[in-house]
Regions:
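Terminal or standalone catalytic/regulatory effector modules within metabolic enzymes
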Residues: 1-168
Length: 168
């Protein structure tokens, strides 16, 4: 069940199929290259209003407990900003930081990842299933990078933009 190397989570199939269905209703048959382009537009290239730039991750150990601090640089409608989040790992730290920075309440429902290519420079794909806890709306975000942490954080920003991009 691979699509141009992407192994979409089961729940994401319907979400993306709905996007393609709307296009098919307007123009008829949709070619595979156009499907990939729509995937890129919907998930990979969605950088508005929030565009992930970089993140510095620091782990702190206290006994057998770990705390992760993430300092994230991002763009908000083109303006460079920064926030800090603290959590039990990079995804949790960035999620908490985004909630505080943007005044949102989100829940990670699911997370998965896989290699898109092989070798030492392999690209990874990360899928994040998020829910807006205020409205109950859910969506997926996708990130790719040769760094799995960066792919995951891009996935969070992709999902946040899909949830809140049109409303703000």
């Amino acid at each position: 069940d691979s699509f141009f190397g992407f192994k979409l989570p089961r729940g994401m199939h319907k979400e993306f199929a709905d996007v393609i269905q709307k296009i098919a209703e307007k123009q008829g048959e949709v070619a595979p290259d156009q499907i990939m382009e729509e995937f890129r537009i919907e998930y990979l290239d969605r950088k508005e209003p929030y565009h992930f730039r970089k993140c510095k991750i620091t782990d702190f150990e206290s006994g057998d407990q770990f705390t992760t601090v993430a300092v994230v640089t991002y763009s908000d409608h083109g303006e460079t900003k920064q926030f800090e989040g603290v959590g039990n790992g990079p995804i949790d730290a960035v999620k908490r930081g985004l909630e505080e920075e943007l005044g949102i309440s989100i829940k990670v429902l699911d997370y998965s990842e896989h290699a898109l290519t092989s070798g030492s420079g392999a690209q990874a794909a990360s899928y994040i299933h998020l829910m807006d806890q205020k409205t109950g709306k859910v969506t997926y975000g996708v990130g790719i990078s040769s760094n799995i942490t960066r792919a995951s954080l891009r996935g969070i920003f992709s999902a946040v933009n899909r949830l809140f991009g049109d409303a703000q």
